Curated annotation (Swiss-Prot):
It holds the Pfam family PK_Tyr_Ser-Thr. It is a lipid-anchor. A lipid is attached at residue 2 (N-myristoyl glycine). One of its GO terms (molecular function) is protein serine kinase activity. The lineage of its organism: Eukaryota, Viridiplantae, Streptophyta, Embryophyta, Tracheophyta. Its main location: membrane. One of its GO terms (cellular component) is plasma membrane. Phosphorylated by BRI1, ASK7/BIN2 and ASK9/BIL2. The keyword Lipoprotein applies. Probable serine/threonine kinase that acts as a positive regulator of brassinosteroid (BR) signaling downstream of the receptor kinase BRI1. Functions redundantly with BSK3, BSK4, BSK7 and BSK8. ATP binds at residues 62-70, 84. It is found in: Cell membrane. This is Serine/threonine-protein kinase BSK6. Keywords: ATP-binding, Brassinosteroid signaling pathway, Cell membrane, Kinase, Lipoprotein, Membrane, Myristate, Nucleotide-binding, Phosphoprotein, Serine/threonine-protein kinase, Transferase.
Length: 490
């Protein structure tokens, strides 16, 4: 759940929802925080949100080769989402899938990347969760670029993970499938969250562990069943990751511990940054979790109690410990190098946007509109073209109400697809103070033409109008990145 992009979607809510707004529910356990209610998404919504399940939006390990792929996306209200798409052999019975998803979707905690919805249409089975923008624990431990994760942050990760498991256990969801460093994510504030995806199997009768068998609980190898004690064993392997900065097989780690070679187990990058007492206690906890006999392992409640006493620098924000930019810091970054169109969208200069769109015409539609038009020249197609021409005349003469009507007739005709028409109707909606409809068109322009920076810049203008400045800035940044990629290919 990681790489940056700006993929939004259209929320076409089914009739049984009260309105197109996000339904929310308070959570007393989390300080009365308001959470989005679990919902069923349409497949078309999730296609739009992920750019048609574009490979550019894959954020899961092993990319497209994984049996179940996770995509980054964005809903039309600006929220980032993670979408897990199961392979077509998983969850043949959609009712079982829905029941399981609803059960997991009822959980709400600051320690989880919460499940906010699902989708089942035909053979498709998808889960939708909150998106965590700052990568996985595996990335920060095993593939760090600038600085290793600090000791205090590693202890915080261990505690938050234990608290997440305790919360799930208290809610009747004690089983977690394939717990590992890739399941621990970091939110916008750098706080660790446990992915909700592991609370469901990869299929109704599928495997609960996909990692190397060397990291699998011994009882699972014997019985094929996951128990709460199996989860504690896997938690112990994550403790090893945190201590060593490497993915060490439990058997090897235990050999080092029994041989009193604990120093060889610890990450050399942490030398001098923790006390012997703290290191010894964490090794002790890991050893207890990794006991061969399941009954000899601690429960998650006792793990939380032990880890609370080890915490350091508790008053320091996670994003500071992680060394990652925060929202307030992001505002101070160097300004983007914008094209004239991008700059006009930054300033929400609608007149300038209209002039540039009029000037570039339909050159960006090359290879799109005709390629998607399979019908012969019929009366219906001629009517659509006439509607587009009338819309263009109204657009140039700044009669934006007429432009919206004519472009709508062209789009509804369905005989041709044009990102430029969506861009022009987007601007026409903005001129008529209808930013939400404008954003929908900007999103659709990107769905039709995923590599078109203009769509991203227009999304930024719409988001600025809607008061969503942080998301608008991100859309500008993504548009600039896409513009640079296109320039490099020329």
């Amino acid at each position: 759940m990681g790489a940056r992009c700006s993929k939004f979607s259209f929320c076409l809510f089914p009739s049984h929802f009260k309105s197109a707004s996000v339904l929310e529910s308070p959570d007393i356990e989390n300080g009365g925080k308001v959470w989005p209610t679990f919902k069923e998404f349409k497949l078309e919504q999730l296609k739009s949100a992920t750019g048609g399940f574009s490979s550019d939006n894959i954020v899961s390990e092993h990319g497209e080769k994984a049996p179940n792929v996770v995509y980054r996306g964005r809903l039309d209200d600006g929220r980032l989402i993670a979408v897990k798409r199961f392979n077509r052999l998983a969850w043949a019975d959609h009712r079982q899938f829905l029941d399981e998803a609803k059960a997991v979707g009822s959980l709400r905690s600051d320690r989880l990347a919460n499940l906010i919805g699902c989708c089942f249409e035909g053979e498709e089975r998808l889960l939708v969760a909150e998106f965590m923008p700052h990568e996985t624990l595996a990335k920060h431990l095993f593939h760090w670029e600038n600085n290793p994760m600090k000791w205090a942050m590693r202890l915080r990760v261990a505690l938050c993970l234990a608290q997440a498991l305790e919360y799930c256990s208290n809610k009747g969801r004690a089983l977690y499938h394939d717990l590992n460093a890739y399941r621990v994510l970091f939110d916008k504030d750098g706080n660790p969250r446990l992915s909700c995806f592991g609370l469901m199997k990869n299929s109704r009768d599928g495997k609960s562990y996909s990692t190397n068998l060397a990291f699998t609980p011994p009882e699972y190898l014997r019985t094929g069943r996951v128990t709460p004690e199996s989860v504690v064993f896997s938690f112990g392997t994550v403790l090893l990751d945190l201590m060593s900065g490497k993915h060490i097989p439990p058997s090897h780690a235990l050999d080092l511990i029994r041989g009193k070679n604990c120093a060889m187990l610890m990450d050399s990058a942490l030398e001098g940054h923790f006390s012997n007492e703290d290191g010894t206690e964490l090794v002790r906890l890991a050893t207890r979790c990794l006991q061969y006999e399941a009954r000899e392992r601690p429960n998650v409640k006792s793990l939380v109690t032990s880890l609370v006493t080890l915490q350091k620098e508790s008053d320091v924000a996670s994003y500071v410990l992680m060394g990652i930019p925060h929202e307030t810091e992001a505002e101070e970054e160097s300004p983007l190098s914008l094209t004239p169109f991008g700059d006009a969208c930054l300033r929400v200069d609608l007149t300038a946007i209209q002039e540039i769109l009029s000037k570039i015409g339909y050159k960006d539609d090359e290879g799109i509109a005709n390629e998607l038009s399979f019908q012969m020249w019929t009366n219906q197609m001629q009517e659509s073209l006439n509607s587009k021409k009338q819309g263009d005349l109204a657009f140039r003469s700044k009669d934006f109400t007429t432009a919206v009507d004519c472009y709508t007739q062209f789009i509804d005709g369905g005989t041709m697809v044009s990102p430029t028409v969506h861009a022009r109707r987007c601007l026409s909606y903005l001129m008529n103070d209808n930013a939400q409809e404008a954003l929908t068109d900007a999103l659709q322009a990107q769905v039709v033409s995923p590599d078109w920076p203009t769509a991203l810049y227009l999304q930024a203008a719409c988001l600025f109008k809607l008061g969503m400045e942080a998301d608008a800035q991100q859309a500008l940044k993504d548009g600039t990145t896409l513009e640079a990629k296109k320039s490099n290919k020329r």
